[in-house]
Amino acid sequence: MDEILKQEMQKELTTRILPYWMERMVDQENGGFYGRITGQEELMPRADKGAILNARILWTYSAAYRLLGREEYKEMANRAKRYLIDHFYDSEFGGVYWSLNYRGEPLDTKKQIYAIGFAIYGLSEFHRATGDPEALMYAVRLFNDIESHSFDGLKNGYCEALTREWNEIADMRLSEKDANERKTMNTHLHILEPYTNLYRVWKDARLERQLYNLIGLFTEKILDKDTSHLQLFFDNDWQSKYPVVSYGHDIEASWLLHEAARVLGDAGLIAEIEPVVKKIAAAASEGLTSDGGMIYEKNLTTGHIDGDYHWWVQAETVVGYYNLFRYFGDRGALQHSIDCWEFIKRHLTDDVHGEWFWSLRADGSLNRDDDKAGFWKCPYHNGRMCIELLGE
């Protein structure tokens, strides 16, 4: 069962996910990658280019090259690295721009810490895969930028966003669906993730300290100890706002926290975090449905449930429950992982063009209104799902 799953992951990665971006998204005219393909498979060559998409392409192809050693993946990763450094990196103030126009000129120059985290994730993975010193140098620079400008030495944690020059910004939101709060679970999760990866290749004392601190923030501030769900939005003093449960973030955080503790290699910390990992994954399973998929979120104030099945939530569900099987021998979790993979194959994979669709709606209809590739729709969640199950 486990071996069949791995064979299917290799096939998914190498035939449906990775070729799609190599064949359709490389912008030969203006450099880097196109900004968008619609859910109807229409390329938008003049769409804006997002830092997150570029950084996630960099991570995905670097990791695929590290795992499989194929030269075309290295070329794709190198293209993403070059474009990130030459166009997204702000050589005057540090950090990365949020977006560029299709020609590669800065558009939204704000410093969204989440995006800088992904740049570190991609660059550190490229260094891990190739030994490239330039990628590590820029990853370390960006780490220093986050620590210098975003870290709150007084109240702890990291602020959400700043202006290009690292000053206060009125609208800190990562996206339109987010609350305008200073500290968020999502940004902390996606600082934990690149810091973990950077620590694999750069054993710096401050980085180590901040990685320990981030794990502590999750267990002490972000985790709701009563429900074992993650709280999503906080004011500067860590007071939780807007009680919403995000099942996909719960299951994603469960394995990323576990990974961070393992990479630090501290047996005491691992022993401390393992019960937390299991509790968060158990809480996330409230979002699983009888057909194997995982729904999006629940508003605890109104009781409203968003029952759509987003592509990224399904990918993280496969990884998160497989993690419980891999490290704790949990057969029930393996079944959750397999069931969700079967759900993905039934409902989300595009057998005609490749890649996955954005979501299956709660009413059972396929969502083709949202992007097939774009600012938020990247090869990272589903690519990483395959890479995680094939690795170790």
Curated annotation (Swiss-Prot):
Signal peptide coordinates: none
Top-level taxon in the UniProt lineage: Bacteria
Keyword tags: Isomerase
Entry's pH dependence statement: Optimum pH is 7.5.
Keyword Ubl conjugation: no
EC number: 5.1.3.11
Keyword Isomerase part of the UniProt annotation: yes
Top-tier EC class: isomerase
GO BP terms: carbohydrate metabolic process
Temperature dependence as stated in the record: Optimum temperature is 45 degrees Celsius.
Catalytic activity: D-cellobiose = beta-D-glucosyl-(1->4)-D-mannopyranose
Gene Ontology terms for molecular function: cellobiose epimerase activity
Family: Belongs to the cellobiose 2-epimerase family.
Primary role: Catalyzes the reversible epimerization of cellobiose to 4-O-beta-D-glucopyranosyl-D-mannose (Glc-Man). Can also epimerize cellotriose to Glc-Glc-Man, cellotetraose to Glc-Glc-Glc-Man, lactose to epilactose, and mannobiose to 4-O-beta-D-mannopyranosyl-D-glucopyranose (Man-Glc). May function as a mannobiose 2-epimerase in vivo and be involved in a mannan catabolic pathway which feeds into glycolysis.
PANTHER family for this protein: N-ACYLGLUCOSAMINE-2-EPIMERASE
Name listed for the protein in its UniProt record: Cellobiose 2-epimerase
